[in-house]
Amino acid sequence: MKIDILTLFPDMFTGVFGSSILKKAQEKEAVNLRVVNFRDYTTSKHNSVDDYPYGGGAGMVLTPQPIFDAVEDLTKETERKPRVVLMCPQGERFTQKKAEELAGEEHLIFVCGHYEGYDERIREHLVTDEISIGDYVLTGGELASMVITDSVVRLLPGVLGNHASQVEDSFSTGLLEHPHYTRPADFRGMKVPDVLMSGNHKNIDEWRHKESLRRTYTRRPDLLDERELSKQEKKWLEEIKREQ
């Protein structure tokens, strides 16, 4: 996969893209990450990428020319049209399902804005997606693009050492992930559940499944509205409700 980031602040990405999973993914050639300063594409004699909004108002608006030219340059040698994703608080809420969808693409371009906003023609005629990572406002789209890049890249084949970890992640199954424990079995009187040390894998799987359901019901009950529960899950859910 190829991922290009269009930004005015490329230095922000150095640490994130040069460490942990994203670094390993690049070393394995699972992904090619490029950070591009779209100011390099401006034709303004003052090297500017923004201007005052028509009709008046506070703030500056990103002009279309450098962003259009940057995207066109990055895609001139590609056969398949890439997904051009605008980081925007007005966009579609980012979810695990969206991450899985984007992970199936060959080429992604993330456009990170600053200032008051984007010229509307960028939205109407250039981008394919607008994505928000939450109902709050950031200084720019850089942090949001890092979040999405990390979420997408870890889904690529061969990136994670254990595929089971990916499958069992919170949201991948529609439920929040179950609790985890490690040594020691007794820490200051706080003990690991006996079932996890029983060696009975069937009982362990059932415990983890039920605890995932419990955690989802307690912390994110809205997720259960989107999930068709199995007969066993419905039974467990009734037990969980009685235990509350």
From Swiss-Prot:
CDD domains: TrmD-like. It catalyses: guanosine(37) in tRNA + S-adenosyl-L-methionine = N(1)-methylguanosine(37) in tRNA + S-adenosyl-L-homocysteine + H(+). Pfam families: tRNA_m1G_MT (PF01746). Its EC number is 2.1.1.228. The keyword Transferase applies. GO terms for molecular function: tRNA (guanine(37)-N1)-methyltransferase activity. It comes from the Bacteria. GO terms for cellular component: cytosol. S-adenosyl-L-methionine binds at G113, I133, G134, D135, Y136, V137, L138. The keyword Metal-binding does not apply. Its main location: cytoplasm. One of its GO terms (biological process) is tRNA N1-guanine methylation. It is found in: Cytoplasm. It is an enzyme of class 2 (transferase). Keywords: Cytoplasm, Methyltransferase, S-adenosyl-L-methionine, Transferase, tRNA processing. PANTHER family: TRNA (GUANINE-N(1)-)-METHYLTRANSFERASE. Homodimer. Belongs to the RNA methyltransferase TrmD family. Specifically methylates guanosine-37 in various tRNAs. This is tRNA (guanine-N(1)-)-methyltransferase. It comes from Bacillus cereus (strain ATCC 14579 / DSM 31 / CCUG 7414 / JCM 2152 / NBRC 15305 / NCIMB 9373 / NCTC 2599 / NRRL B-3711). The gene is trmD.
